[in-house]
């Protein structure tokens, strides 16, 4: 009986088991590489026994993603993989390009500026260790209080449509932080949407498999994070792609 099953905990196969973190990047702000270096230190301090590897994907940036910044990053974090796409395709395409370079048992993706607290990232990894195939960030009121009206409406509309049209029980698919094991990674790699709603396609595909364990985890936004507004028409266009 599937309902009575529980995930099988993930056991470290070796010391310093690697976790890949895919970081899509578009027009990053000045100093982005230094922040990544600092976040890497925080993660390794909190995740004893893991080797953290960043996979940074440039999604056709017109500014910010400079040779100097990349060199500074890779000099400090030599294991970092840089995927330098010259054409902007969208976050979904960028994440898939990054995942293609990942060979770790556990992995996750989030925005390059790490909008959520490191403790929230560690919580995602905790549930992957517990055996869940996909772990989804569930945003709380602190997140929505920092959204523009347009983006807030789009987020609530997305959750409503996820439930009504797609039958998803995990409706907060747009959190921008998700973890997965190899099984979950295969669902992500099979998505096709290039932009806003690739997260929804990912969770929808994973939810169709009754043997896949999905877990929602409450996450906290960093207080200093400023969330950008959404361009007009993006949500509607991506909804058409999904449907």
Residue ranges and their predicted role:
Residues 87-101, 118-192, 196, 224-233:
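Acceptor/aglycone-binding surface of glycosyltransferases and processive sugar-polymer synthases
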Residues 50-61, 83-85:
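Short beta-strand/loop segment that forms part of the nucleotide-sugar
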Residues 107:
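Short aromatic/hydrophobic "clamp" motif used to bind/position activated sugar donors
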Residues 67-101:
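Conserved donor nucleotide-binding strand/loop of the catalytic core
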Residues 1-19, 30-31, 167, 191-243:
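Hydrophobic helical membrane-anchoring modules
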Residues 29, 58-67, 114:
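A conserved acidic beta->alpha catalytic loop
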Residues 4-7, 28-45:
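Short, well-formed alpha-helical segments that are part of the catalytic scaffolds
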Residues 17-23, 39, 43, 52-57:
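Hydrophobic targeting segments
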